[in-house]
Swiss-Prot record:
Catalyzes the conversion of 3-deoxy-D-arabino-heptulosonate 7-phosphate (DAHP) to dehydroquinate (DHQ). This is 3-dehydroquinate synthase. The keyword Calcium does not apply. The gene is aroB. The lineage of its organism: Bacteria, Pseudomonadati, Pseudomonadota, Acidithiobacillia, Acidithiobacillales. Its main location: cytoplasm.
Length: 364
């Protein structure tokens, strides 16, 4: 088992990664408030890991309530925030309770937001069971739900008490979900770490085979990269925005197609190759660098084309992106592999050209 700290002063918390740690009550104990616990999970994860976590909590003499949501992006809704709050109120849970998010990014995001708003804030623990959640969404305190007009438009920055990532849970992760998580892994190499990107190029076969040593490196390296960035810019006032590489295009794809058609990592993968293309059109990166980025995403088995929809549809969703300022879309682009830049100075014609170049079945 390895641990690292997200250094945020009084809001600092540990990230624990290892095998079999879902059953380690000693890791959970320091992160729990004195009151009861509610485990929020989904219909896919509950049959696999809920009983193990319940036994861990029982060993700590913690009464626990289980809230099982339908699996899928559609569960990230205000209706389910009401559902969670209603269950907690009906059970008499007060401000001394702790919520445990057992699942992937959807469960983590909605549980964190529920914790942020229930009785003006209660403690919560992230217990990620997908690669994407382990390397990205469980770390950093971004919580929220979707709105029909945009992804993650209703939410809060609210840090967990701990992240406890049992890598044994990846054994049951479907291949598509596993590859989706690798999009965020590639992102860290692109924005911050050229050496890590090169390592991924050389070792992607081992990662896709889920070889333990390769997986361990991927998870720990990604968590450290994100923890370092979050520690320097918790509320995304500047630097932290680079973590959104591929997300401006990606969120537009998710919203335009209806949440659920694309996994988040799949949309981000398309968004990253689009961002690389836009960077090349603006002479920020060389064509050879764009080719390397495309090749790695493709080698990972992730999609590289968006569905053919009117360009205006995509642009409409991009304008309501949270990074937009004064109605102007801001992009995270690349100045080479391992270096990102935040800019709102992008010619509209270049955005349209990129969208058209990466749409399936012709251009809209």
């Amino acid at each position: 088992m390895r641990s690292l700290c997200v250094d945020l002063g009084q809001r600092s918390y540990p990230i624990h990664t290892g095998t079999g740690i879902l059953a380690d009550s000693a890791l959970f104990a320091p992160a729990l408030s004195k009151g009861p616990v509610a485990v929020v999970t989904d219909s896919n994860v509950a049959p696999l890991y809920l009983e193990t976590l319940q036994k861990t909590l029982k060993a700590l003499d913690k009464p626990s309530l289980s809230i099982i949501l339908p699996a899928g992006e559609e569960s990230k809704s205000l209706d389910n925030i009401q559902e969670i709050a209603g269950r907690l109120l009906s059970a008499g849970y007060g401000r001394d309770c702790t919520l445990c998010a057992l699942g992937g990014g959807v469960v983590g995001d909605i549980t964190g937001f529920a914790a942020a708003v229930y009785q003006r804030g209660v403690a919560y623990i992230q217990v990620p069971t997908t690669l994407l959640a382990m390397v990205d969404s469980s770390v950093g305190g971004k919580t929220g739900v979707n709105h029909p007009l945009g992804k993650n438009m209703i939410g809060a920055f609210y840090q967990p008490q701990a992240v406890i990532a049992d890598t044994d849970t990846l054994d049951s992760l479907p291949e598509r979900e596993f590859r989706s998580g690798l999009a965020e892994v590639i992102k860290y190499g692109l924005i911050n770490d050229q050496g890590f990107f090169s390592w991924l190029e050389d070792h992607m076969d081992a990662v896709l085979a889920r070889e333990p040593d390769a997986l361990t490196k991927v998870i720990r390296h990604s968590c450290k990269d994100k923890a370092d960035i979050v520690a320097r810019d918790e509320l995304e006032g500047g630097l932290r925005a680079i973590l959104n590489l591929g997300h401006t295009f990606g969120h537009a794809i998710e919203a335009a197609t209806g949440y659920g058609q694309y996994l988040h990592g799949e949309a981000v993968a398309i968004g990253m190759v689009m961002a690389a293309d836009l960077s090349r059109r603006l002479d920020l990166i060389r064509e050879s660098e764009q080719d390397r980025i495309y090749a790695l995403v493709e080698a990972t088995g992730l999609p590289t084309l968006a569905p053919a929809l009117p360009v205006a549809d995509y642009l409409g969703f991009m304008r309501v992106d949270k990074k937009a300022e004064g109605g102007r879309v801001r992009f995270i682009l690349l100045r080479g592999i391992g270096s990102a830049v935040i800019t709102g100075e992008v010619p509209p014609a270049a955005i349209t050209q990129t969208l058209q170049a990466f749409m399936e079945h012709g251009h809209a």
